[in-house]
């Protein structure tokens, strides 16, 4: 059994870069890049690099073996993908910049070489796999919900990428739009607009200008019935 705080601290952006910079070849294998909002990058199974996000947000998307499309959102401190098993790498995947992004492009072979010495307990991989487990579990739960609840669920899921104003009030990420929320919730834009209008009428959401604000997180959780949803075992 590991302490979450220990794993998360070791796998933080700052510590990963600190460990990589211990190697004198760091500047030859790690490059800091700026990528503009709206840029889309397509990847095949050959993954020579992975990316460590310092600023901005991205959407990582791929099609599963049965044709199901998966998407995941990542912000500062995350890496959209980390190729652990070759067989698990999708044939085609895409990263879309939801905002201007600054990240480190890291050669995976260099990362493996350094971490054999600096992370012998594989804390960084454990943190990545734990996060992936939570995300896939959330997708499973969301798939069981009706259209309205999927929208509620998506809004609540975006809290971690937002800015908490008060204990019960959160600014949502600036990239969020009706179209994006409909996409994340697997609903139509028209139905999404209707549900958001109802939330505004109940004084739960402010979406007339950006950033959108959930003004009553607990009430939104109550509408979803969040406490009754299955929890990650």
Kindly label every feature range from the protein language model:
Residues 1-40, 78-80, 84-87:
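Cyclic nucleotide-binding regulatory module and flanking cytosolic helices
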Residues 31, 40, 57-62, 79, ...:
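Short beta-strand segments in beta-sandwich/barrel cores
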Residues 32-33, 41-43, 47-54, 71-72, ...:
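His/acidic/aromatic-lined binding-pocket segments of jelly-roll/cupin-type domains
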Residues 48-61, 65-66, 76-77:
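Glycine- and acidic-residue-biased ligand/ion/polar-headgroup-sensing regions
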Residues 71-137:
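Cyclic-nucleotide recognition modules
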Residues 122-184:
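Polybasic "coupling" helices that flank or enter modular domains
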Residues 161-233:
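Phosphate-/nucleic-acid-contacting segments
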């Amino acid at each position: 059994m590991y302490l979450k705080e220990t794993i998360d601290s070791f796998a933080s952006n700052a510590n990963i870069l600190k460990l990589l910079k211990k190697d004198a070849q760091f500047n030859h294998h790690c490059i800091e890049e700026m990528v503009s909002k709206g840029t889309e990058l397509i990847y095949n199974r050959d993954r020579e690099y992975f990316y460590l996000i310092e600023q901005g947000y991205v959407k990582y998307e791929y099609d599963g073996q049965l044709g199901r499309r998966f998407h995941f959102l990542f912000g500062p401190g995350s890496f959209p993908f980390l190729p652990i098993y070759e067989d698990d790498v999708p044939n085609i995947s895409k990263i879309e910049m939801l905002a201007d992004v600054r990240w480190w492009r890291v050669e995976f072979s260099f990362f493996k070489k350094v971490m054999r010495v600096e992370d012998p307990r594989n804390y960084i991989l454990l943190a990545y796999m734990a996060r992936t487990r939570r995300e896939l579990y959330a997708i499973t739960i969301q798939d069981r919900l009706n259209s309205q609840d999927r929208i509620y669920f998506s809004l609540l899921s975006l809290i971690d990428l937002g800015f908490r104003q008060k204990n019960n009030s959160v600014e949502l990420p600036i990239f969020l739009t009706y179209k994006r929320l409909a996409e994340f919730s697997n609903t139509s834009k028209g139905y999404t607009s209707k549900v958001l209008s109802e939330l505004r009428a109940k004084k739960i959401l402010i979406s007339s200008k950006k950033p959108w604000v959930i003004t009553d997180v607990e009430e939104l959780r109550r509408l979803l019935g969040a406490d009754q949803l299955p929890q990650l075992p």
